[in-house]
């Protein structure tokens, strides 16, 4: 009988990976719990603003703060000129150094929209956003806005759909 010299090595690695997956997946699943903290309508983006509070965007246009300890939820007013249609609405939100950045589908008039990004100083009652980016040209569509935000080394990164 001829045995490939790599056969034993392949079997050894296969068994090692198999046992790792079998035993580690069980231990991961035992420590994972899922709790519904708030009744939200189409939540899209979220970011911790403290150890206890999470700010959340709802695609339908609301921004809410949820206290994950007390489970208290309250809505924050804002001045965004958003457009809810298809995949459009309020999208991602990110917090850093007492500022918020949000991506959203902006109503540019005459059924034209764009993916836009705005910035505001954190205020838990009323957010006064100022646009820092508007995709050009605005188009007549309710689809493919994207969008996720990330901050790295004081740079704001944003993804968008193929608009």
Identify the function of each model-found stretch.
Residues 1-11:
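N-terminal secretory signal peptides that target proteins for export/translocation
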Residues 8-10, 17, 71, 96:
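A generic signature of intrinsically disordered, low-complexity regions enriched in glycine/proline
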Residues 13-14, 78:
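Hydrophobic alpha-helical segments and their boundary regions
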Residues 16-17, 27-28:
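Cleavable N-terminal signal peptides
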Residues 28-163:
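Acidic, Gly/Ser/Thr-rich repeat motifs that build Ca2+-stabilized beta-propeller blades
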């Amino acid at each position: 009988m001829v045995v490939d010299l790599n056969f034993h090595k392949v079997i050894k690695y296969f068994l090692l990976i198999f046992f790792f997956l079998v035993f580690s997946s069980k231990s991961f699943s035992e420590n994972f719990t899922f709790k519904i903290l708030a009744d939200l309508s189409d939540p899209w983006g979220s970011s911790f603003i403290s150890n206890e509070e999470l700010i959340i965007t709802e695609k339908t246009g609301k921004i809410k703060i949820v206290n994950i300890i007390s489970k208290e939820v309250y809505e924050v007013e804002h001045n965004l000129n958003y457009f809810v249609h298809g995949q459009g609405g309020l999208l991602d939100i990110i917090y850093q150094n007492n500022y918020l950045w949000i991506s959203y589908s902006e109503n540019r008039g005459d059924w034209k929209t764009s993916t836009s990004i705005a910035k505001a100083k954190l205020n838990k009652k009323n957010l006064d956003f100022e646009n820092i980016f508007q995709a050009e040209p605005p188009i007549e569509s309710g689809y493919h806005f994207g969008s996720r935000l990330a901050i790295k080394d004081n740079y704001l990164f944003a993804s968008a759909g193929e608009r």
